[in-house]
Amino acid sequence: MAKSRFEYVREYEVHDTLLPETYIVVRIDGKHFHEFSQHYSFEKPNDERALKLMNASAKNVVMAYSGDIILAFGESDEYSFILRKDSTLFRRRRDKLSTLFVSLFTAQYVALWPKFFPEQPLSHKRLPFFDSRCVCYPNTTVVKDYLCWRYVDTHINNLYNTVFWNLVLKCNLTPREAEQRLSGTLSSDKQEILFSECGVNYNNESEMFKKGSLINRKGEIMHIDVVKQIDELFAGF
């Protein structure tokens, strides 16, 4: 390949290679999705179509790199992709992995949008975009705990949001009043408020809302108790 006298500038490029023999987690997260969801009138506390769009986008990412991805887990506007310890995808370069996953996910999200929101075309003034990060976890124990953390976070956030929005939408509290009503409450308190004051049994809520979405390397989307099945999920990895 012909070279020019300007090619020396490549020497300033820095390629950060992630640690070998560690699990890589690439987590993508929606940016300004509060405003985005308001603009497209997402249902509160959960919009089933929006979550299924996230799942479909993530599934296509998993299938594109099923040889490297063990599992993916999603809640709300975020998704985590867990790569094998021995993955050599893009020679484990942090910049390549981070930009690849977030750009592929975003492309899938935009391409699949009409399937889930056929009556609401995306506006060029309000497009979805995400950030991403890569984190290395040294062993199976730690990466299992990472997945359990995201699963438990799903439950905590969803329970709060479910009660909060039912207090606002069904009980006519202001957002400030709902926030004060829930201040200092435990999980059991929130479920009791939801049932006694809003007439909603949390146990009857969608499993996808309560447990998030797990995608295996076959592309199967599951809504399961990750903590109870964590060892089974990582069998062989």
Curated annotation (Swiss-Prot):
GTP binds at residues 29-34, 76-77. It comes from the Eukaryota. GO terms for biological process: tRNA modification; tRNA processing. Pfam families: Thg1 (PF04446), Thg1C (PF14413). It catalyses: a 5'-end ribonucleotide-tRNA(His) + GTP + ATP + H2O = a 5'-end phospho-guanosine-ribonucleotide-tRNA(His) + AMP + 2 diphosphate + H(+). Binds 2 magnesium ions per subunit. GO terms for molecular function: GTP binding; identical protein binding; magnesium ion binding; tRNA guanylyltransferase activity. Its cofactor is Mg(2+). Mg(2+) 1 binds at residues 29-30, 77. Keywords: GTP-binding, Magnesium, Metal-binding, Nucleotide-binding, Nucleotidyltransferase, Transferase, tRNA processing. Its EC number is 2.7.7.79. It is an enzyme of class 2 (transferase). Mg(2+) 2 binds at residues 29, 77. Adds a GMP to the 5'-end of tRNA(His) after transcription and RNase P cleavage. Belongs to the tRNA(His) guanylyltransferase family. PANTHER family: TRNA(HIS) GUANYLYLTRANSFERASE-RELATED. This is tRNA(His) guanylyltransferase. The lineage of its organism: Eukaryota, Fungi, Dikarya, Ascomycota, Saccharomycotina. The gene is THG1.
